[in-house]
Amino acid sequence: MEFILSLIGSLLLIICVLVSVAFLTLLERKVLGYIQIRKGPNKVGLMGIPQPFCDAIKLFTKEQTYPLLSNYLSYYISPIFSLFLSLFVWMCMPFFVKLYSFNLGGLFFLCCTSLGVYTVMVAGWSSNSNYALLGGLRAVAQTISYEVSLALILLSFIFLIGSYNMIYFFFYQVYMWFLIILFPMALVWMSISLAETNRTPFDFAEGESELVSGFNVEYSSGGFALIFMAEYASILFMSMLFCVIFLGCDVFNLLFYMKLTFISFVFIWVRGTLPRFRYDKLMYLAWKCFLSFSLNYLLFFIGFKILLFSLL
């Protein structure tokens, strides 16, 4: 019985995430529309609300094409695996339920984000297109660079709360959010989240002027839709993780979802506001600024814990 309940819970979570992704794309198109002083999608149904579902039907009913010289199997598997990973990573969220509150949640998140690099790399390589390969290489270099700082910052918090289980973030933030006492870290984490999800101003994987569309240039119909959904599911997850780490994480509270919506909106807001970085500046930022910052904070937290234990 418990297994059936867990299975139903997993299916519900996946369905809810996919519906959220659909409405996040609609929100993005609306917000970008208003930023550019136009309406955005407003013709389909009431205020354009069914628009993402119409887009999904259109994309999945189009003919599946593939480049003649591409590596057929890996070309098709990489978008599927990409979406699978971005849905699978939701397991580490602290939902106060047996299935979704396991003790190595932080480690599980790092494993899933590291595996996400391979899907981009395989998608770029198997297309057998120079544009796709260059886009894939850029995305891999960028993701690996920023993952180091991401892991160090997460490790700092794990030292602070003393567990890999994400549920401890809730216990430690009952009286005060970590955002208030660690505001610089929150800003750096937000920047790293933007870089990890290949969003503006770090969207070098899909620089239109240089790489046409990046690693997904040869994908059409269903393959493109799966890559697109995986990207937006990871944006939602990174927004939720920001709320868990910095804004307290009582998932049964409506306020939590309002915070999640606001952080997702910030991702879109940044896209509508900032231009793309220069590539050397991106690498400089990752290795010289963020890495030294996160290492200093990690050493500070380790020293802080040692001091606490020596005093006790």
Curated annotation (Swiss-Prot):
Where does it live in the cell?
Mitochondrion inner membrane
Q: Name one GO molecular function term.
A: NADH dehydrogenase (ubiquinone) activity
Q: How does it sit in the membrane?
A: Multi-pass membrane protein
EC code: 7.1.1.2
Which UniProt keywords are present, listed alphabetically? Electron transport, Membrane, Mitochondrion, Mitochondrion inner membrane, NAD, Respiratory chain, Translocase, Transmembrane, Transmembrane helix, Transport, Ubiquinone
Q: Per its UniProt entry, which superkingdom is the organism in?
A: Eukaryota
What reaction does this enzyme carry out catalytically?
A: a ubiquinone + NADH + 5 H(+)(in) = a ubiquinol + NAD(+) + 4 H(+)(out)
Q: Which Pfam families match?
A: NADHdh
Tell me the Gene Ontology biological-process terms attached to this UniProt entry.
aerobic respiration; mitochondrial electron transport, NADH to ubiquinone
Which chain regions cross the lipid bilayer? 3-23, 77-97, 104-124, 151-171, 174-194, 226-246, 250-270, 289-309
Primary location recorded for the protein, binned into one broad class: mitochondrion
Name a GO CC annotation attached to this entry: mitochondrial inner membrane
**PANTHER family on file:** NADH DEHYDROGENASE SUBUNIT 1 (PTHR11432), NADH-UBIQUINONE OXIDOREDUCTASE CHAIN 1 (PTHR11432:SF3)
Q: What does this protein do?
A: Core subunit of the mitochondrial membrane respiratory chain NADH dehydrogenase (Complex I) that is believed to belong to the minimal assembly required for catalysis. Complex I functions in the transfer of electrons from NADH to the respiratory chain. The immediate electron acceptor for the enzyme is believed to be ubiquinone.
Q: Which HAMAP family match?
A: NDH1_NuoH (MF_01350)
Similarity section: Belongs to the complex I subunit 1 family.
Q: What is the official name of this protein in its record?
A: NADH-ubiquinone oxidoreductase chain 1
Organism encoding this protein? Drosophila melanogaster (Fruit fly)
